[in-house]
Amino acid sequence: MSFAEKITGLLARPNQQDPVGGPEQPWYLKYGSRLLGIVAAFFAILFGLWNVLSIITLSVSCLVAGIIQMIAGFIVMVLEAPCCFVCIEQVNGIADKVDAKPMYFRAGLYCALAVPPIFMCFGLASLFGSGLIFATGAVYAMMALGKKASAEDMRAAAQQTGYGGNGTAASTTNDRAGIVNNAQPFSFTGAVGTDSNV
């Protein structure tokens, strides 16, 4: 395999086929999540370096948070853009293994990587750098949930469970009858006899 074919294969990564049985995502979510992940990784590494430089103020927790944030940025960059690490052979295999896993795995991984630096050293650098990684995890979580069902499917499911309003089981004339069971109306009886009117 030539060097040009290797680069082309790595850059074609967003066009790879969706896994069988997984939810189909719109193109803007698929490419947007990758782009957000790349930008998040870059800023996480940059602001992690800023937190590491806080050793000047003798803040060990910010030093550790910066190191964790830089490692998180590196991991996100490896998984989202393995073409940035052409010199490391194992990167493409790791990215393929994670791509084969369900979307919620990647969402949970990104959210778990983003939280510790924020709690260890709360500041703009850790909040922005790790916050972008957390946002990438949130986008992957939305992609893992899949598309919303059509209106007809939701209406049919509501009628099967008896909440449809015009189903066969105990249909009433009031549309809100199935929302709250055993609800009592409010009564306005006036002031209590022992009230001090304060």
From Swiss-Prot:
UniProt keyword Transmembrane, yes or no: yes
GO cellular component: cell projection; endosome; presynaptic membrane; synaptic vesicle membrane
Membrane topology, record value: Multi-pass membrane protein
GO biological process: bulk synaptic vesicle endocytosis; cell competition in a multicellular organism; clathrin-dependent synaptic vesicle endocytosis; photoreceptor cell differentiation; positive regulation of neuron apoptotic process; positive regulation of presynaptic cytosolic calcium concentration; synaptic vesicle endocytosis
Keywords, in A-Z order: Calcium, Calcium channel, Calcium transport, Cell membrane, Cell projection, Cytoplasmic vesicle, Endocytosis, Endosome, Ion channel, Ion transport, Membrane, Synapse, Transmembrane, Transmembrane helix, Transport
Span of the signal peptide: none
Compartmental location: Cell membrane; Cytoplasmic vesicle, Secretory vesicle, Synaptic vesicle membrane; Presynaptic cell membrane; Endosome
One Pfam family recorded for the sequence: Cg6151-P
Major localization listed first in the record, in broad terms: membrane
Listed GO MF terms: calcium channel activity; identical protein binding
UniProt-annotated site: Calcium ion selectivity, residues: 80
Transmembrane segments: 36-56, 67-89, 114-134
InterPro entries the UniProt entry points to: TVP18/Ca-channel_flower
Complexes and interactors: Homomultimer. Associates with the dally/ magu complex.
Family statement: Belongs to the calcium channel flower family.
Role, per record: Transmembrane protein which mediates synaptic endocytosis, fitness-based cell culling, neuronal culling, morphogen gradient scaling, and calcium transport. Regulates synaptic endocytosis and hence couples exo- with endocytosis. Controls two major modes of synaptic vesicle (SV) endocytosis in the synaptic boutons of neuromuscular junctions (NMJs); Ca(2+) channel-independent Clathrin-mediated endocytosis (CME) in response to mild stimulation, and Ca(2+) channel-dependent activity-dependent bulk endocytosis (ADBE) in response to strong stimulation.
Protein name, as recorded: Calcium channel flower
Protein source organism: Drosophila persimilis
Gene that this sequence comes from: flower
